[in-house]
């Protein structure tokens, strides 16, 4: 198969291929960018594989960065863009179900492609638009099939994260897993416990944010792989509650997706759960806030104080989840409440602790903090203008 017109992303990278070939080596576009070009999907990173060894690649180009040279990858800076050029390679025995014990550089494209995960990702593209397909990846693309390259069990034993990638690709592409590939994913699922939580989180997160997340999640659940993810043993029945969300619903942000997961699981200790997933504190706070907002909305309408206490984006995300559940929503009420706030944080108050100490002789300590909190709430609730004279008069009256 040949692409008559190369997508612009490849055309911009052609000078890199041409320089490598002019130096006497082979070079091809490889991986996800080729797959996405053939599917007419947006292309993100353009990766290049070459028969040139890293030191040879560095001699070809004026500006390079050693980003993963031990694995054969050199970052080439060309035409104000960055391209990863990786030497054709083979990999020895995997010591931890994630990293090969040894990487060997080779001059053969076939040897390089046969180590890849799925046939649709084992395609190469030359400078003329000719697709090199050694594992029937084009047929699988046409038939919307996810099939492991070679023996599926070997691929997943080499790198167990490929199991999560398989579910993620399902969610992204709406493809079906080939029977033997799915069977190997089920058999190798216990190996997921050997993979770093951070890497699993990235794949699971991408799955949840993908357009066909239901398909990927269903495969993750039915395969039993969910049993080997942090704190999710025995969670299948509860996670199936996510399928009750509106059929056309897509999560708008990671924190929203994970809040929905937390709510489906009825997690009581959100911080503890997300700590096991090793998320950032900022992310955990957003997810926890969303769970709290959902609890508030299940009991009453939101108030000005709620709009002050929680980020407007999170309030709207929580409302989106309610809408997906078929519950009553009022987006305009939230926006109106937010717009009516006199202040959105305590830094916007006309007074601070230092001013009160100077004006009224307050000492640092709990009492001063209590007064500031009372002022903050009075201003937010609309009981007190955010005006210096009014605030001072309010304090005088309370003294």
Swiss-Prot record:
Source domain of life: Bacteria
InterPro entries in the record: Bact_CCA-adding_enz_type3_sf, CCA-adding_enz_C, CCA-adding_enz_firmicutes, NT_sf, PolA_pol_head_dom, PolyA_RNA-bd
Signal peptide: none
GO MF entries: ATP binding; CCA tRNA nucleotidyltransferase activity; magnesium ion binding; tRNA binding
Note: A single active site specifically recognizes both ATP and CTP and is responsible for their addition.
UniProt cross-references to HAMAP family, sorted A to Z: CCA_bact_type3
Protein name as it appears in the record: CCA-adding enzyme
Annotated source species: Streptococcus sanguinis (strain SK36)
Higher taxonomy: Bacteria, Bacillati, Bacillota, Bacilli, Lactobacillales
């Amino acid at each position: 198969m040949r692409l008559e017109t190369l997508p612009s992303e490849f055309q911009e990278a052609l000078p890199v291929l041409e320089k490598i070939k002019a130096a006497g080596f082979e070079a091809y576009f490889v991986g996800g960018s080729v797959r996405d070009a053939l599917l007419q999907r947006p292309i993100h990173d353009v990766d290049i594989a070459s028969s040139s060894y890293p030191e040879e690649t560095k001699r070809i180009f004026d500006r390079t960065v050693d980003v993963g040279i031990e694995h054969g990858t050199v970052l080439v800076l060309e035409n104000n863009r960055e391209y990863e050029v990786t030497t054709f390679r083979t990999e020895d025995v995997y010591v931890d179900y994630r990293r090969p014990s040894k990487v060997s550089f080779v001059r053969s494209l076939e040897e390089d492609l046969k180590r890849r995960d799925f046939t649709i990702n084992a395609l190469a593209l030359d400078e003329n638009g000719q697709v090199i397909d050694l594992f029937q990846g084009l047929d699988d693309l046409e038939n919307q099939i996810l099939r492991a390259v070679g023996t599926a069990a070997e691929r997943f034993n080499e790198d167990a994260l490929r199991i999560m990638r398989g579910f993620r690709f399902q969610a992204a592409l709406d493809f079906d897993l080939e029977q033997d590939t799915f069977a190997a994913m089920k058999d190798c699922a216990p190996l997921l416990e050997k993979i770093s939580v951070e890497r699993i989180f990235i794949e699971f997160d991408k799955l949840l944010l993908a357009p066909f997340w239901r398909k990927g999640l269903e495969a993750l659940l039915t395969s039993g792989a969910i049993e080997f993810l942090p704190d999710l043993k025995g969670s299948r029945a509860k996670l199936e509650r996510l399928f009750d969300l509106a059929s056309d619903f897509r999560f708008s942000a990671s924190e929203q997706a994970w809040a929905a997961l937390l709510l489906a699981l009825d997690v009581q200790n959100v911080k503890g759960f997300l700590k096991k997933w090793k998320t950032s504190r900022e992310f955990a706070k957003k997810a926890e806030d969303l769970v709290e907002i959902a609890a508030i909305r299940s009991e009453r309408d939101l108030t000005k104080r709620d709009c002050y206490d929680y980020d407007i984006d999170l309030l709207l995300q929580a409302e989106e989840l309610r809408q997906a559940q078929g519950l009553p929503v009022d987006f305009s009420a939230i926006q109106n409440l937010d717009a009516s706030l006199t202040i959105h944080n305590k830094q916007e108050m006309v007074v601070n602790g230092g001013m009160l100490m100077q004006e009224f002789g307050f000492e640092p300590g709990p009492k001063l903090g209590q007064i500031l909190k009372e002022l903050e709430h009075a201003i937010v609730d609309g009981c007190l203008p955010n005006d210096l004279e009014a605030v001072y008069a309010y304090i005088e009256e309370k003294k």
